Amino acid sequence: MVTLILKNLKEVEEIFHSEIETICKEKKDYYNELFKKYDKDLTLEVIYNKSSALYKVSASLDLKSKKVLVAEEDKNPVKALNKVFSNLKKAVKKQYELERKDYVYKRKR
């Protein structure tokens, strides 16, 4: 089961809040489907920071072996969020496959 934590959303302008929340909930559902047989409860953490004109968005997901963390910067917070989630998807799938490969290797020995 994946739990979603949104931090510092108040730094983002009000007009983007609903769009950001819907994107995050969709991604949470995606990760729930991907990790439905995973035996550890996961937390998907999305953090927003605003410095001058740029939004820095970072997302992390705790897996068994390590914490996968991805960060992006953009002027538009929604674009930055989409970039973060696409990069996080690649990194999480890669790490998940490594964990699976390691598990199968240990099981055969």
Where in this protein do the model-derived segments appear?
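Polyanion-binding surfaces on beta-sheet-dominated domains and ring/shell assemblies
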Residues: 1-109
